[in-house]
Amino acid sequence: MSLSQKILELLKNTETIKSTDIDVRSNELYPVLLSLASKEIISFTFKEQIIYKLTEEGESILKNGSYEFNLYNSIGDNGMELLEVDKYNLGKVNAFKNKWIKKVGDKVYKSADNVEDNVKNMLNNVTNKIYQKEEISLLKKRKLIYQAKEVVYFIKKGPLYGKDSDNITELISKMVISGEYKHLNFKPYNFNTKGNIQSQGALHPLMKVREEIRKIFLEMGFNEMTTNKFVESSFWNFDTLFQPQNHPSRDAHDTFFMKTPSTTSYIPIDYMKMIKKIHSVGDFDSDGHFSDWDIKEAEKNILRSHTTACSTRTMLEIAKGEFISAKLFSIDRVFRNEALDATHLAEFNQVEGLIVAKGLTLGNLMGYLKRFFEKLGITDIKFKPAYNPYTEPSMEVFGYHKGLKKWIEVGNSGMFRPEVLRPMGFDKDVRAIGFGLSLERPTMIKYGISNIRDLIGPKVDIEFIKKSEMCFFN
């Protein structure tokens, strides 16, 4: 007999039964009750009540008797030696307390006749749910029972009890045409049932800020560059930007070098010759680096350390045709072999802006940066003179982080050197200004995050991502 049949059978001769009348666990009973109630065969309510259960020691005493009772039964007519009594340490104290035994000389003798194992009887009452206040207090004190909660279900007959319980869940055209539906029991709609909460994706705060920054660039008249090359050659990442081949940043401590393929052969020959000349002997009023330039060093593949490598590719294409000024931007991933701390990661997203036009000045660059950061909502910014191999003059950009209560670097900027622009074929009066900004730092400022590892990495709280506010910059 199934559990549902057992419940219906018990209800035959009474209006109400309790779950205690059914020998089954609560977690097994509940889904069966829900199923029967949904068909209106039964209805049920429940109530929580306090019960007491036996501990492991209590179960042992219920089975084998209490320690004091067992000691009493072990003492013969000739008594028991004290050393032997000591073996019954757990029962000795209570046996003396109950005056079941007495000490005479070096032996212990019975001092009562026909004693009853009260502790075992109390435990038996507990198993039968007969609770006496004094007994419960004593058993709890001896840690033979513990308190627990029990759910008791009160089950009654429903409107459809005793009727055909096979409720129809689907109405089909055949039932309507034949009129059969008039004689069928349809399962009623339950409008109070809550549907399952569907899991859903959530945009990471970085992606929210990225999209807003992209909108800002587009509002300022910039066009997006193609930056789908995570792997670059040292030629585009360093050499085209007039970075010496013996520069410290090209060392393995700052750069991730590719193992396979370790080198590239796709370098424009004519442009490569111009780059070699500007590095080794100089040109266009520049003295170069006064050092040899090795093509093998330029062919080494790396994970790009900045998206400026994509900027040089784009500027080279602009220089090939009739000159037209351009405002370009990109937001993409870059990689640097740096020590990890609260504000640095080995891979991060770089926001890059590039303007190529005639007659540009450092004032133009500062104006664009101030306007850009104002749109981001970061009004507290300042500039600091800096050095970059490919820009002169150069500036670091700092924003004030209210959480860390200090200024943190949010980007770098500068005017591209003639040694970068002239080998591409640009005229002398063509200037280019560029700025590279971290996407993570403005995001940290926007969302009040002080440790970048709370934003990216294995320790990020998924609830933070789900509940992070939409990003709007005023």
From Swiss-Prot:
Annotated GO MF terms: ATP binding; magnesium ion binding; phenylalanine-tRNA ligase activity; tRNA binding
Amino acids binding Mg(2+): E392
Residue numbers spanned by region Contains the major tRNA-Phe binding sites: 1-150
Top-rank lineage group of the source organism: Eukaryota
Keywords: Aminoacyl-tRNA synthetase, ATP-binding, Cytoplasm, Ligase, Magnesium, Metal-binding, Nucleotide-binding, Protein biosynthesis
CDD domains reported for this sequence: PheRS_alpha_core (cd00496)
Keyword Nucleotide-binding: yes
Annotated catalysed reactions: tRNA(Phe) + L-phenylalanine + ATP = L-phenylalanyl-tRNA(Phe) + AMP + diphosphate + H(+)
Assembly and interaction partners: Tetramer of two alpha and two beta subunits.
Name listed for the protein in its UniProt record: Probable phenylalanine--tRNA ligase alpha subunit
